[in-house]
């Protein structure tokens, strides 16, 4: 990893230091995804079979996972893994249940009541990537809030393996959260199928889940077309660590590597006011890399990442807020005291004993988070992500008589005569 001194960089160099590996979508990626989506919309399952054979190397007669396959998955998953997933589900449920809203009602004027009522989204589609490794934890993170929200139907897509099966742990994770319909589909084609529907898959109202640049681009394209809403831009993973001189170099290095091993397009950043800490972390990276099975992938990610020396921790937080990381680790002596300075981050991890990996798996928070700077305006997945808040209002005759004059003045100011007339008729006055 490159070591940079922030104070020695001009504006352009600072911008370059914070640029993600996948900051923009290449035109060819955009065009390829658009063509794939159009093919799925036109030819349905036939297109899915051809695309799956080409990209996943397997020919499928049926995309739906059968009951026999679910049973085989249950038998294949080791008891300790199943128990770990059950424990994670319990904590994810506890955290997400605590944040649920039941709506509210308020009388805004005598005889005028305004409400918010909560309704589940009817049918949702969950995407669980497999890429270089299956991610059953993502099935847990999406399935639990979908269940709590009360969605009528939940569909899950995950890429098939070369033998036409799906990773058993993903199937068990799906069942643990109540998901019954799982399809062997990956990539942009899965997004297209869930958005528009095919002979095998129903069209969904909203799509959830992370993925590579093709999946992220597909989600954005189907959302722009109005076919399905999406949770957020959720692309390659990233972490930013702010560490002081008292941080443990081995811990910091381990946190950086835990994100770097996700893929070559991941990005990890360290900001510290301590030259000694930066040097020690750099040395620890080499020590720990030698022990990793995915060292080659991690090295590719580290080649595009930075160790940045700052003058003060205040400067570090200013940089972090500008970057708006998916994951932000505060390896500081008084981490909670600095929390007030965090303005934009998907999820924050406080102190030396809160590795980002806990949030990935089992602390209870959700690991489906905004990336690529989207944390400035988006939040991570929650139960509310799977619900609609519907506005309701009711006015009595006394109510409209009391506030109608306000509506008349505003309607006339906007030149909307029919609006004014709809109020005036009920009030028994001239529009």
Curated annotation (Swiss-Prot):
Q: Which positions bind substrate?
A: 237, 259, 262, 327, 360, 414, 419
Q: Which SUPFAM superfamilies match?
A: ALDH-like
Question: What role is this protein assigned?
Answer: Catalyzes the sequential NAD-dependent oxidations of L-histidinol to L-histidinaldehyde and then to L-histidine.
Q: Does the keyword rRNA-binding apply?
A: no
Q: In which pathway does it act?
A: Amino-acid biosynthesis; L-histidine biosynthesis; L-histidine from 5-phospho-alpha-D-ribose 1-diphosphate: step 9/9
The entry marks the following residues as binding NAD(+), namely 127, 189, 212
Q: Which cofactor does it need?
A: Zn(2+)
Q: Which Gene3D superfamilies match?
A: 1.20.5.1300, Nitrogenase molybdenum iron protein domain
Q: How cofactor binds (record note)?
A: Binds 1 zinc ion per subunit.
A GO molecular function annotation here is: NAD binding
**Would you tell me the protein name for this molecule?**
Histidinol dehydrogenase
Identify the HAMAP family for this entry: HisD (MF_01024)
Q: Which PROSITE patterns match?
A: HISOL_DEHYDROGENASE
Catalytic residues of the enzyme: 326-327
Output the Gene Ontology cellular-component terms.
cytosol
Family indicated by similarity: Belongs to the histidinol dehydrogenase family.
Classification via Pfam families: Histidinol_dh
For this UniProt record, the keywords arranged alphabetically read as follows:
Amino-acid biosynthesis, Histidine biosynthesis, Metal-binding, NAD, Oxidoreductase, Zinc
Q: Look up the EC number in the record and give it.
A: 1.1.1.23
Reaction(s) catalysed by this chain's protein:
L-histidinol + 2 NAD(+) + H2O = L-histidine + 2 NADH + 3 H(+)
Return one Gene Ontology term, BP aspect. Answer: L-histidine biosynthetic process
**Superkingdom of origin:** Bacteria
Positions contributing to Zn(2+) binding: 259, 262, 360, 419
InterPro entries the UniProt entry points to: Ald_DH/histidinol_DH, Histidinol_DH_CS, Histidinol_DH_monofunct, Hstdl_DH
Catalytic class of the enzyme: oxidoreductase
